[in-house]
Amino acid sequence: MMALEYDMVGTCMTAGGNTMVPTFGAEAKLGTNPIAIAVPTLNKPPFVFDAATTTIAGNKMGLLERIGAEMQPGWVAHDDGTPDMNGGGEFQYAKGPQRMQLPLGSTRELGSHKCYGLAVSFDIMCGMLSNGFGFKTLDASRRAHYVSAFRVDGFA
């Protein structure tokens, strides 16, 4: 949102970790890979968007686990990678070194491949352009970032 102070469009992405299971995958290969964008407007409040590419943000999942909330359908995958579409249980699939979160959409039929594709794209932008070399070389604790700001009047 710092770009808004200068009447600029700001974008930020983060990649890394291994919490997201690819569509039809059996192992977590990507992080939640969130994106944030802020766009100034002339007379109205700015457009600000921030979202993970998984069905639920990692920090929100941790918070809900601490307060004893139940899993919702489509948040996580079973150990074999199949989406858990029943929900209602504890966070058993979300614990341990591999959280097995699903891409937004949960299943191929509901469009999970689209958010998985976005997550890979964000990983490329973050990892490759920052010399982080992408998810193949980042261990679970490392992150790579992409940050940009565009002058709106530069496109007029």
What residue ranges belong to the model's regions?
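A glycine- and small-aliphatic-rich helix-loop capping segment at beta-alpha/alpha-beta transitions
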Residues: 1-10, 26-33
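Glycine-rich phosphate/pyrophosphate-binding loops
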Residues: 7-19, 122-140
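Structural beta-strand/beta-sheet cores of well-ordered domains, especially the beta-sheet scaffolds
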Residues: 8, 33-35, 45-47, 72-73, ...
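Phosphate/diphosphate-binding glycine-rich loops and adjacent basic-rich segments that engage nucleotide
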Residues: 20-94
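Generic structural signal for well-ordered, non-membrane alpha-helical segments
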Residues: 30, 114-118, 156
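Secondary-shell segments that build the walls of catalytic and ion/ligand-binding clefts
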Residues: 69-134
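Catalytic-core signal marking the mid-to-C-terminal active-site face
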Residues: 124, 135-156
